[in-house]
Swiss-Prot record:
Annotated residues for binding of S-adenosyl-L-methionine: 48, 50, 67, 85, 107
Gene3D superfamilies in the cross-refs: Vaccinia Virus protein VP39 (3.40.50.150)
GO cellular component, one term: cytoplasm
Keyword Cytoplasm (UniProt): yes
The gene coding this protein: rlmE
Protein name in the entry: Ribosomal RNA large subunit methyltransferase E
Active site feature: 147 (proton acceptor)
Primary location: cytoplasm
Keyword Transferase annotated: yes
Record key words, sorted: Cytoplasm, Methyltransferase, rRNA processing, S-adenosyl-L-methionine, Transferase
SUPFAM superfamilies: S-adenosyl-L-methionine-dependent methyltransferases
Source organism per UniProt: Borrelia duttonii (strain Ly)
C-alpha cells in the first residue's frame, strides 16, 4: 500500500488543485506542449485537477468534462460538465456537440479489483472506447493523452494510436507512484482516418 498523502498531495493542496494527479499532466505538458487553440475534452474528470489545469490553459474554446461522478468546479464560462458513462450513446451525443476537439485528456481508470489481469483488461477496454471517441471527435492535428495500465494488451492501443497520429510516445511522469503500473500514451498530430 502507498502513502496516500505524499509530497505531490501536499503540493496540490497548497496550490489549490483538487488532486495530486495534476502534476502528471503539468509535467507532460511542459515537455510536449499539449495545448493549442480549440475545445478540450477531459474524460474521467473527477475530482477535477486535470480540468483545473486544462481550463487555465484554454485558448479560444470550451472545456468539456465527462465523468460518472460529479466534479466540484466553479468555472464561470466556457465550461460544460457531462455526468455519464462514455459507453452510452446519449453521452457521446453530448460530447459530439462540442467537437471537434484540439485536445482530449483522460486520467480515467476503471474501478480496480486488485487482480492485475482483470484491472489491465478493464483499462484496455476503457482506452479502446476513448480511442474510438478521439477518432470521431478530434480535429486534424489534435492531441490525445490517455492513462494506461501496463501488463495487459496495452501495446495494441499503442499501435492503434500510431496508425492515426504522427507522434506517439509512452510517458511515465515523476508524479506516478513508484509501485503503480500506470503510464500515459501521448499521441500528437491526429490525421483523420
Amino acid at each position: 500500500m502507498y502513502n496516500v498523502f505524499d509530497e505531490y498531495s501536499q503540493k496540490a493542496k497548497n496550490e489549490g488543485y483538487l488532486a495530486r494527479s495534476v502534476y502528471k499532466l503539468i509535467e507532460i505538458d511542459k515537455k510536449f506542449s499539449l495545448f493549442s487553440s480549440g475545445n478540450i475534452l477531459d474524460i474521467g474528470a473527477s475530482p477535477g485537477s486535470f480540468s483545473q489545469y486544462a481550463y487555465a490553459n484554454l485558448k479560444n474554446g470550451v472545456l468539456v468534462a465527462v465523468d460518472l461522478n460529479d466534479v466540484n468546479l466553479n468555472f464561470t464560462s466556457n465550461f460544460y460538465f457531462i455526468k455519464g458513462n462514455i459507453y452510452l450513446d446519449e453521452v457521446y451525443q453530448k460530447i459530439k456537440i462540442f467537437s471537434p476537439y484540439s485536445l482530449i485528456v483522460s486520467d480515467a481508470a476503471p474501478s480496480t479489483t486488485g487482480n492485475r489481469l482483470v484491472d489491465t483488461s478493464n483499462s484496455f477496454n476503457l482506452n479502446i472506447r476513448i480511442f474510438e471517441l478521439a477518432c470521431e471527435s478530434l480535429m486534424r492535428g489534435g492531441n490525445l493523452l490517455i492513462k494506461v495500465f501496463q501488463g495487459g494488451e496495452e501495446e495494441q492501443i499503442f499501435y492503434k494510436l500510431k496508425s492515426c497520429f504522427r507522434v506517439v510516445k509512452k510517458v511515465r511522469p515523476k508524479a506516478v507512484r513508484k509501485n503503480s503500473f500506470e503510464i500515459y500514451f501521448l499521441a500528437k498530430d491526429f490525421a483523420k482516418l
